[in-house]
Amino acid sequence: MSQKEQTLMTPYLQFNRHQWAALRDSVPMTLTEDEITRLKGINEDLSLEEVAEIYLPLSRLLNFYISSNLRRQAVLEQFLGTNGQRIPYIISIAGSVAVGKSTTARVLQALLSRWPEHRHVELITTDGFLHPNSVLKERGLMKKKGFPQSYDMHRLVKFVSDLKSGVPQATAPVYSHLIYDVIPDGDKTVAQPDILILEGLNVLQSGMDYPHDPHHVFVSDFVDFSIYVDAPEELLKSWYINRFLKFREGAFTDPDSYFHNYAKLSKEEAVDIATSLWNEINLMNLKENILPTRERASLIMTKSANHSVNQVRLRK
């Protein structure tokens, strides 16, 4: 089978970096270098070039989709003779631990909020919808954090469903990576945003991923556009270990950190522990629960070294 025939058979349009960058058209750069520095993750090299060549074309595409969605809503309101409720456009961002989902989410939030049509862009991570440590310990799931059974999926689905139903406001629990737990009474209020960006390991999962907790509605049912941030397994492992080493010298040194004891490790000991955590927990979760959802995404961004995106696949 020729490459052209294979391309015609795939559900995705495929772009290399140069082809994707050309789709920026004339969209202006609205972020400064200082802003980009604040947006990037602890383990990433995010440059103006990366934002210009990858994220500006993506924000342009999303703006087209969002504008089309608003026109569709207006047609429905005209047909029904109703006043429009503010229904957010929901973008989900999935991918492995350490792949850079949070940076992608923050950059898109910053770029999309600068478009004149939709200023109010909220970002919520699904970490907040993990069961509290007390519940996970009771159920023997502390080593399964991030796996499907560790989430309060009913609460997450209700949160997204409420926003899509046009409720004036909804609350989302907030997770602290410092204390490695959901913050008690730390809920964040989300009030009718134009766009909601939902970032997490589990946002592309569906009923087949939750056989232990059967229910009929899932987060993915409410998502308008989904992004999967992808990278080769060996890079993900390397990024995870490097991030762990940086935390060892930074966040873990805080006496309040759940992982404060890790700050006392030698570099060799830290690498051994990070490698073990990757192999026994994160790699297993990736293979069993995250990677199988990749082909459900509207768009797949594939990263190479230094977290630079070298391929984009867009669902036809």
Curated annotation (Swiss-Prot):
EC number per UniProt: 2.7.1.33
Which GO terms of type biological process are on file? coenzyme A biosynthetic process
Name the UniProt key words of this record, in alphabetical order: ATP-binding, Coenzyme A biosynthesis, Cytoplasm, Kinase, Nucleotide-binding, Transferase
Q: Which reaction does it catalyse?
A: (R)-pantothenate + ATP = (R)-4'-phosphopantothenate + ADP + H(+)
Q: Tell me which InterPro entries the record gives.
A: P-loop_NTPase, PanK, PRK/URK
Identify the NCBIfam families for this entry. panK_bact (TIGR00554)
In which family does this protein belong, per the annotation? Answer: Belongs to the prokaryotic pantothenate kinase family.
- Tell me the GO molecular function terms: ATP binding; pantothenate kinase activity
Q: Which gene encodes it?
A: coaA
In this chain, ATP is annotated as bound at 95-102
Query: Where does it reside?
Result: Cytoplasm
Single GO cellular component annotation?
A: cytoplasm
Pathway connected to this protein = Cofactor biosynthesis; coenzyme A biosynthesis; CoA from (R)-pantothenate: step 1/5
Name the record gives this protein: Pantothenate kinase
